[in-house]
Amino acid sequence: MTTTTTTTTRVASSSSTRNNRILKDANGDIGEHLRNHIHLTNCIHLKNNMHKQSPVLTDRALMRDLIVLQRSRSLRDPSASPPAWNTPPSVVDLLPKKGDLVEGGRRSVDLKKSSRRLSALSGSSPVVNFGTSKVTPSDERSGPVSGERDSGRRVKREESSRKSYRIGDDYQNVNEVVSHGSGSKASRRLSRVNDAMVKTLSDQLNEVVVGDSDDVVSSNVRPRVRYGGGGGGGNTRGCAGGMSRPKRRKFRGTRRVRGKSRDTGGGKSEMSVASNTLPQVEKHDGEKEGFGEQNMTKACGIPFNWSRIHHRGKTFLDKAGRSLSCGMSDSKGGRKGETNERNGSDKMMIQSDDDSSSFIGSDGEALPLLVDSGENDGWVHDYSGELGIFADSLLKNDEDSDLASEGRSGEKKHKKKSHVNARHRHRQQHQSLTEKYTPKTFRDLLGQNLVVQALSNAVARRKLGLLYVFHGPNGTGKTSCARIFARALNCHSMEQPKPCGTCSSCVSHDMGKSWNIREVGPVGNYDFEKIMDLLDGNVMVSSQSPRVFIFDDCDTLSSDCWNALSKVVDRAAPRHVVFILVCSSLDVLPHVIISRCQKFFFPKLKDADIVYSLQWIASKEEIEIDKDALKLIASRSDGSLRDAEMTLEQLSLLGQRISVPLVQELVGLVSDEKLVDLLDLALSADTVNTVKNLRTIMETSVEPLALMSQLATVITDILAGSYDFTKDQHKRKFFRRQPLPKEDMEKLRQALKTLSEAEKQLRVSNDKLTWLTAALLQLAPDQNYLLQRSSTADTGGRESSDHHLDPSSDAAGGRSSGLDRRRGDSRKNRPAVEEIWLEVIEKLRVNGLREFLYKEGRIVSLNLGSAPTVHLMFSSPLTKSTAEKFRSHIMQAFEAVLESPVTIEIRCETKKDPRNNVHHHHHHPTVKDKSLPQSLALIGHDYNIDGSGRSEIVEVTESNGQRRQQQKQQEEERTEPVGSSALARARRKHLEASQSQNQSQSIVRGKVSLAHVIQQADGCSLQNGWSKRKAVSIAEKLEQENLRLEPRSRSLLCWKSSRGTRRKATRLKVRTRRARPHTLLKLVSCGKCLSTRSPTR
């Protein structure tokens, strides 16, 4: 009896000791778990705030700490996960359940219930027996007492293993006391331990939290149990075994290889913590109730295996920033702590799948690590989905980047609570104008009306495609439009237009927590395997909202990625998946992708749209800028709004009003005034000053190609009439007169052509400055170009009109040769001659005469010898005669300019007949003696005020002398023999040529032929085309045939024509025909002749 009482007392005291130690270990685990959370929070805070000071060393060290904490098992809470079917029961299961309360509402340790649980577990559960020593048959027959002894032995081994890493004398002493029952000494030792360990749960928790946490070693390591395949006792190893506890290792960025745990039969695969599903837990109904209540009230709300089972395949940034929802809240949020904690643990209840043991996260969005109260701002980031791939690539290559941390978490900017916005917040880091004014809705997109209309209708009507391609130049809004389109597809609002920006989907995307929108780019920076993991992990997951994948800058995508993407597209065709490819050109995409996608082209933005956007941004940012400066920025951006915004931001940093010279200086341009001065010198053939001015401009570090491009732009503006010459016009020579005359416009067009040809040489040359100088010196045209009018330049085939002089006025050969010499001398100083001619025109006092000379006249040569002589050329005889009338006024103007007597020679341009190459010189020596009306009547023109004339076409009749000469020639033809026909033909040709010349010079009223009408109407003297000559020749042939056949219709066998008809045919001939023999005609008389000679007539 005494022995039984002693044994019962010993067992009770040992059970009390064991329960107290188990309670302390459990409380120590919770306290250490909280300390790890605090440390993780500090690491994340340092990561997001300290990288500005030392972005290399601090980021790398903190990144390593985050990796270690994420992989560490000390962060997992054993109190939040129920025991699995095949997993050994945790020591937390031995704690008191619901209802074990004492006075004051605090928990206490019930030794009897704990001993019952220990005995029940030791007697029933086959998993609890994981001691390292074999159990003898005598021990098995010893009944409950021996079972309790074994339990005590196991608990003490576990306790000793948790307190230290080495197996020493303490473990052996405790083992001896428990196994051999050494009487009163052991009882006294156990009673002292029980008195020291019996404390409440809150007191122990306070002691653990207050105590020093540096030397605390986590004992919450998940046991790894390996079951032997043979019979007898199982050799087990694990954290609760104590004898074979593995040593701790320091993590250096490497992953811990998980050991395989085998089943008792050896046929099952590895047992992971993720297999603790709810259906398996439901088998332990009694244990689940108490455990759930304790989890809801006292735990932090995170299962100890949460970091492994929640959203597999995610990076440590995802796990640290989203999965851990417990943190430190502010003081005002403490009242709602229990409610928020209970709601958070309810949301994080994991749903299981019947066919899989792995957990799948719910569709609800996870919260950030530190959840503040509703008064604080939300998290904002710039990237939604590419960071998952970026972080995986970061871990793989052991790299560091601020993009991963800043893009996922952002940096907080503290505000006053009165200006709090729950969804948006501003970072301390400066935001560029491009980021700050990024379009958020379709309405904000600029200059892409067709694309916006098409995509908006597709969202409203839910007519979605699988593949979209947005292509176009850079800075036109392709990526922004893709993001807006993705947000609109996932928007939950029932109103249009979408996206609304207020629904849960839009808010989650703005906060960076939307998993339905994944953005990847640029693709060339990431691994092919990571992209495939992203596609395989998200495409096949069913979701109510469409999943959108944005591949930005897919120009660098490899062929393997295209092949894999095409396969994924084929598999994802019936699902709610949308792929948006953003590139600059369609040439980089394979034909398989292009044939399946909807293509949207984003053209360059107009300068007016860019100016409007920049003006709006400048008003928002309070930037003082001129309107012309905005136009210059827009013109230099080449249709890219992003480039224009970056230029405006760069100019705003100068801190002064932005003007056009400031923009030109910043972007490396030359002012328009300097460019016009350079062009004026080059076109005026001022070689020395042109070279000096060019070197002065090149000293400002301007590229020769850029300078040539600016010169071409200025010339184009001048030709278009959009350039203003009001500044410094009096100092220039070529651009002195406004508007520019036609000849000067021709010079500018020729200069533009010269610059365009020189640009090709400039691109391939090493000495660009020399080629640019040569091109500018070639802008001054030569003499042939100066003497050639714009009207004659179109013909191309004719020679310059100044080479054909009037032979009647220059009868002497010496005079014409002297004029040629003077003309050659004048070509050397042609710019000076032109300036003198312009000064002469300005000296004229008659306005109509000044206008007339400017349009119709031009100076050919100027001889400033002993007898100064001026040669003037006019386009037509009428203009020449008008100039002769005002000879005195012109002479006075020349004498006023040259300050010496001058002789003026007025000439008319020669005209060339295209048919017979006969030069007609319209020179009338008697014009000087006639008055203007008489002169007009003589040449047969009605002159108008504006200088244009109207010609009257008449037929030339023959004089009496010509008529007698013609009759004599006909008589000779009748009487001459047959052998002299050649001489007769020659005489007739000479006669016809003289008649044709007389016809063109003498003009009287009469009848007209069809050929002459065509010639006069079309300006036969100026024609050189084949079709017009052909039409004239055909008309002449028809006229000749009609005239020859006219008398033959009167009587039969009449081969003679009247003299009048013969004369008409002779005048109209151009090519003479071979004369027919008249031998037969002499023998046979004509019926017409007989009828005329009959006396009856």
UniProtKB/Swiss-Prot annotation:
GO terms for cellular component: DNA polymerase III complex. GO terms for biological process: DNA replication. Residues 1-22, 74-168, 220-293, 321-358, 400-436, 790-828, 913-932, 956-1003 are annotated as: Disordered. It comes from the Eukaryota. ATP binds at residues 472-479. GO terms for molecular function: ATP binding; ATP hydrolysis activity; DNA binding; DNA-directed DNA polymerase activity; metal ion binding. Residues 245-259, 411-429 have a biased composition (Basic residues). CDD domains: HLD_clamp_pol_III_gamma_tau. Residues 346-358 have a biased composition (Low complexity). This is Protein STICHEL-like 3.
